[in-house]
């Protein structure tokens, strides 16, 4: 595996590069083209990936602890089991990214708040935005579903697709669905079975 620790790769064209297990700790990858790059299990701790193109990149099990991903394009990237702890994802494009089992503890989300703040304040506010209580949404079995038939957003807004949600809230609904489908949003209240 390549050792590129602290390397200056700003604006580098690494499209489709095979960087599996590479050491890119503290590397400067600002505005780098990493479209479709294979970064499986790469060490990108504290790397600067601001405005990098990571569309369709394979970042499974990558270490992105404390990485700067501000304004990075992670559309359709595979971030399964990635360590994003304390990473900065403000203004990043996470559309269709796979975040299954990713560690977002202390991470800043693309909307500017820390993941913990998102869970504590944004999730309850979004769930209750249309007038239902969190308890009503949970009681409807919304945390048992990962489709638009009765997922939390379907229950909260009485809709079956994102486009039917209030326009002002669609970006937040999209964000919630991505994080929920990745299993990263726990049920906000204990159910009777857990209880």
Question: Residue ranges of each PLM-predicted region?
Answer:
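Extreme N-terminal basic, low-complexity initiation segments
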Residues: 2-12, 17
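Intrinsic low-complexity/IDR segments
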Residues: 1-5, 21, 25, 35, ...
